[in-house]
């Protein structure tokens, strides 16, 4: 066999399977599920009123929209794996900023988390289109939903509960999930 004499470092890595992408979808759901409830509480606490909180979310949304539209262009200049890694890094930066708890840091954390979500979403879906054949796309989405169901069900409740125990706790947990998502 021809591959018998090829050193291990030269062998091609295995193609990712549907379950591998579903695991990534579950980890992303864990990060976002905890943040979807804890982040509004943190923003409201530091800004003090609903109007300022709404303005902060509007600005984060505008920035994330522009950023998300630029991700495909950016992946032409840098490899997609580095764009994906930068998205995970933005999640970690957002968690670190949210833990500090100042007005500016929590507002910047909101923007970083929105940019991270846009980046990882675009890169993740591009990877799925690259590695999952057309016949398995329906199965891929179904398996992703199964892996993401529990984090999306438990995460918001867990985020609020942890926030009431200790304000930085949901961000630490989301940071741990973001590190696992990066790995």
Regions found by a protein language model. Give the residues of each.
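Helix-loop boundary and gating motifs at the non-cytosolic
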Residues: 6-61
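Intracellular juxtamembrane helix-capping segments at the cytosolic ends
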Residues: 39, 119-132
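Residue-level signature of mid-helix packing/kink "hotspots" within the transmembrane helices
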Residues: 61-69, 152-153
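Helix-to-loop junctions at the C-terminal end of transmembrane segments
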Residues: 67-79, 163
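Structural signature of the two symmetry-related core transmembrane helices
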Residues: 82-96
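Helix-loop junctions at membrane interfaces in 12-TM secondary transporters
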Residues: 99-110
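Symmetry-related core transmembrane helices of the 12-TM Major Facilitator Superfamily/SLC fold
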Residues: 170-183
């Amino acid at each position: 066999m021809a591959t018998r004499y090829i050193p291990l470092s030269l062998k091609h890595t295995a193609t990712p399977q549907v379950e591998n992408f579903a695991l990534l979808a579950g980890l992303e759901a864990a990060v976002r599920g905890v943040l979807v409830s804890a982040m509004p509480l943190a923003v409201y606490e530091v800004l003090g009123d609903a109007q300022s909180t709404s303005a902060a979310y509007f600005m984060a949304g505008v920035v994330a929209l522009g950023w998300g539209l630029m991700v495909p262009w950016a992946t032409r200049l840098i490899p997609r794996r580095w764009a994906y890694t930068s998205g995970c890094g933005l999640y970690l930066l957002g968690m670190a900023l949210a833990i500090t708890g100042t007005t500016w840091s929590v507002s910047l954390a909101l923007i970083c988390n929105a940019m991270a979500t846009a980046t990882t979403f675009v890169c993740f879906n591009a990877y799925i289109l690259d590695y999952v054949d057309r016949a398995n796309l329906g199965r891929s989405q179904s398996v992703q939903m199964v892996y993401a169901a529990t984090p999306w069900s438990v995460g918001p409740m867990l985020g609020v509960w942890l926030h009431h125990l200790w304000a930085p706790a949901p961000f630490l947990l989301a940071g741990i999930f973001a590190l696992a998502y990066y790995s």
